[in-house]
Amino acid sequence: KKNIFIIILILFSLLINQYYGNKGIFPVDSFAHFDTGFRILLGEHPFKNYWIVSGPIIDYFQAILFYLFGANWQSYILHASIINAVVSVATFLILIKFNLNIYYSFFYSIIFSVLAYPTSGTPFVDHHSAFFSLLAVYSLILAIKDDKKFHWVLFPLLLSIAFLSKQVPSSYVIISIILILITFSLIKKKYYWIKYSFLSFASFIIIVLIFGNIQGIKLSSFLQQYIFYPQTIGTQRISDFEFTFRGTIGHFKFIYIALIPLFFLNLQKIIFEKGYYKHKDFYYFLVLILFTFSLIFHQIITRNQTFIFFLIPLLFAFS
């Protein structure tokens, strides 16, 4: 039964994104990685042959798909469809892991797949960064739950991929996770995970540096284009931010509504259960709520197309 649901979910997630990817386009954003993915096939590389401020991971993955299936619109959309299928199946599996009824898990995952990548249809940096961050969140939750080395190794890799998709919202998620892990370590007196996560992150950095060196990409070019220049954009957006009830609260009201059961359930436990802050459920709650607010903050600051309504079925499922 589980395998049948997974197969159905994969097919549905792929097909629904292929459908909406062919329904329409955004004049600039929809083509953002078509040209750059094709340029990699021609032997050019980001940071070296063309200026780029986000999305190198997306460009290389798109180049692979173009190589396998040809440089056409359907293989371009397939990129987003694959990510949609991966995060939808991952959502289904983690809900089952937390003993949610398999039918409810399937239902929430189907709704998730409709609200995830189909909002764009085509590969987009914000989506990739958010979804790889979500996969990292899943891995972290499982690391806390099962205490397996694999998950402690995996989540830094996923966060690194998220960051190389786009600096934000991944940076906000990274900061949130660091704060949670500091709290987790001090309260639970567990520090062993540090060596596994650090070695994982260090290995990823070394591989990226070796790859960049082979391709002739200068570290200075990467730092200038991907780290320093985008900070000027972010600083300007933050300085231009103006609080409005509609933009900050009203626009995300359905996400806040989905948060209410999870928030009050855990608030009740914090108040009435002695030592709840030592319980694993408390850290699941922290991870989910800080991930949610990281994405909301990102949407408020960037004021791009709203794409985070996939949080609604996810939050209800964990409530």
Describe the function of each predicted region:
Residues G21-T36, P46-F61, A71-Q74, Q215, ...:
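Extracytoplasmic catalytic/substrate-binding loops of multi-pass membrane glycan-assembly enzymes
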Residues A90-L93, S129-D146, H151-S160, I178-F184, ...:
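Specific aromatic-rich, kink-prone transmembrane helix
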Residues T91-V114:
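Transmembrane-helix signature of polytopic, membrane-embedded enzymes
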Residues K97-N99, A136-L154, A162, I255, ...:
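Membrane-interface transmembrane helices that cradle and orient dolichyl/undecaprenyl
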Residues T119-S129:
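Short acidic/glycine- and proline-prone juxtamembrane loop motifs at membrane-interface regions
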Residues K145, Y172-I205, A317:
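Perimembrane helix-loop-helix junctions
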Residues H151-P169, V173-I178, I206, L290-I300:
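Membrane-interface alpha helices of multi-pass inner-membrane proteins
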Residues I194-R237:
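Membrane-lumen/periplasm interface segments of specific transmembrane helices
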